[in-house]
């Protein structure tokens, strides 16, 4: 994808016409991204594709996982080199994997500058999360804070609830309770999409990866939504 025009906005907090010391610099772009998710007349299944400024594109890229197990060794120069390599390899998309963490601002700034799209998981992966009032409140704060921090970035194309949880519930033979299913639906198909709609209503939300749209319905279908091909690991 072509590089975005990125505009910086400097915001200063005031109270009673006096600067209160709060300053914020936001980077914004003019890219319009939609997700085409609709039935096709000529084939069995549904489209699932990026549409950028009205043009449907083929997503090419990779998962982005933490660059180093020692997080303090990560810096802007190192990330810039990695994302330059992605751009020069003709990537147009990166998926921020839900088994990692919410990244520093400079990662998103560089993606804005290099015209890379981000499929952004929330930080839930490969586990069953039991809800309590305290945990739900903690999750809500985390989602709100990070969506508010990142929503102005032109690179953010999609918010996704989790990595591989729906398909694990559907296909793995681990002990499962009715409460686990209830908590899953409440967290990824009610609470998080509700928060995203409140904080970033123009962005598309997808409940899990892979998924056919949620509710444990053939989550890794090859002709609906997105799919994970695990055969790359074990043939």
Regions found by a protein language model. Give the residues of each.
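Active-site-adjacent substrate/metal-binding segments within catalytic domains
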Residues: 2-127, 136-158
């Amino acid at each position: 994808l072509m590089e975005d025009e990125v505009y910086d906005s400097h915001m200063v907090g005031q109270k009673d016409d006096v600067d209160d010391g709060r300053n914020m610099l936001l980077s914004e772009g003019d890219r319009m991204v939609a997700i085409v998710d609709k039935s096709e007349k000529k084939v069995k299944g549904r489209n699932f594709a990026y549409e950028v400024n009205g043009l449907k594109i083929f997503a090419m890229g990779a998962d982005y996982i933490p660059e180093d197990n020692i997080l303090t060794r990560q810096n802007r120069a190192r990330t810039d080199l990695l994302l330059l390599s992605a751009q020069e390899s003709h990537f147009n998309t990166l998926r921020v994997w839900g088994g990692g963490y919410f990244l520093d601002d400079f990662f998103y700034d560089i993606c804005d500058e290099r015209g890379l799209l981000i499929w952004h998981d929330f930080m839930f992966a490969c586990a069953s999360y039991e809800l309590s009032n305290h945990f739900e409140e903690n999750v809500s704060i985390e989602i709100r804070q990070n969506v508010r921090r990142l929503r102005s970035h032109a690179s953010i194309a999609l918010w996704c609830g989790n990595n591989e949880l729906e398909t694990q519930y559907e296909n793995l033979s681990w002990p499962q309770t009715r409460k686990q299913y209830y908590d899953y639906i409440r967290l990824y198909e009610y609470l998080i999409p509700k928060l995203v709609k409140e904080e970033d209503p123009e962005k598309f939300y997808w409940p899990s990866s892979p998924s056919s749209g949620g509710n444990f319905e053939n989550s890794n279908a090859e002709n609906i939504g997105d799919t994970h091909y695990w055969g790359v690991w074990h043939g």
